[in-house]
């Protein structure tokens, strides 16, 4: 009989014969285990920084004071906190109301790997670095990091970037009719 290479068959809703598989004696299947929806994956990923940043922002002055480094949060630190929270809240809302997923699920065991970037890098590393005495009120006094006009300029750039990103997500959403897996090029 015919010999087929071991390759994934693309097209979940298609019959094997529609994919060119005929007269096959053996079909190999792989159990990917429990599945989790992509929407849930994104919600869990983006929830990390939304939980971690407030904990660090509120807890850092208390923690550093215990080690003899009391400080108060500066305007730049508070601004970063607000922008990070707004960014990830936007991502959560987009996951619920904007994103349309081509695949319904992914293996549940991948959620830890997928969340590592957001929870560790965007959560702990960013939060731990920004909300420390090195950017506190006393440390930035008299520097450009204490210049409100300078900071507001970058807040405006951030806002324009977020709006551009939102526009891109809306464009992509409109390219995929609801309830389909259609992929189109903008």
Question: Where do the PLM segments sit?
Answer:
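Helix-coil boundary and interhelical linker segments in multi-pass alpha-helical membrane proteins
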Residues: 56-82, 125-152
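Residue-level detector of functional hotspots within protein domains
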Residues: 13, 74, 78, 91, ...
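Short, structural beta-strand-to-alpha-helix junction motif
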Residues: 9-21, 107
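Alpha-helical transmembrane segments in multi-pass membrane proteins
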Residues: 30-119
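Short, small-residue-biased leader/transition segments that mark boundaries at the very start
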Residues: 3-4
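Loop/turn positions that initiate beta-strands
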Residues: 24-25
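Cytosolic-biased juxtamembrane loops and peripheral soluble domains of multi-pass membrane proteins
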Residues: 94-117, 127-186
């Amino acid at each position: 009989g015919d010999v087929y290479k071991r390759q994934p068959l693309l097209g979940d809703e298609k019959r094997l014969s529609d994919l060119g598989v005929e007269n096959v004696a053996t079909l190999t299947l792989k159990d990917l285990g429990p599945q989790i929806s992509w929407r849930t994956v994104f919600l869990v990923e983006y929830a990390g920084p939304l939980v971690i940043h407030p904990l660090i922002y509120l807890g850092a002055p208390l923690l550093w004071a215990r080690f003899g480094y009391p400080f108060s949060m500066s305007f730049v630190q508070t601004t970063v906190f607000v922008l990070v929270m707004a960014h990830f809240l936007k991502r959560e809302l987009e996951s619920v109301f904007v994103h349309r997923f081509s695949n319904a699920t992914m293996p549940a065991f991948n959620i830890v790997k997928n969340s590592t970037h957001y929870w560790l890098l965007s959560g702990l590393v960013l939060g731990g670095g920004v909300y420390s005495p090195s950017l506190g009120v006393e440390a930035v006094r008299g520097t450009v990091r204490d210049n409100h006009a300078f900071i507001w300029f970058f807040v405006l750039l951030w806002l324009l970037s977020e709006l551009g990103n939102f526009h891109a997500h809306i464009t992509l959403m409109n390219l995929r009719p609801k309830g389909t897996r259609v992929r189109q090029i903008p």
